[in-house]
């Protein structure tokens, strides 16, 4: 599991966020480069969780 997260960071994934709290979450923004126009849930392809919702803000897609 952890190696997958490291791979995501190393591969420079494109981050297509459907953001709720993800776009307001510093850690998600750092890892994911979430765009500011997000208005949906909090998912983007990186390994973090939203501090607010405790849900994954990222998916492995």
UniProtKB/Swiss-Prot annotation:
Coiled-coil features, chain-numbered ranges: none
Binding site for Cu cation 3: 17, 22, 34
Binding site for Cu cation 2: 15, 28
Basic and acidic residues bias locations: 40-55
GO MF terms, alphabetically ordered: antioxidant activity; cadmium ion binding; copper ion binding; superoxide dismutase activity
A Pfam cross-reference name: Metallothio_yeast
Protein name as it appears in the record: Copper metallothionein 1-1
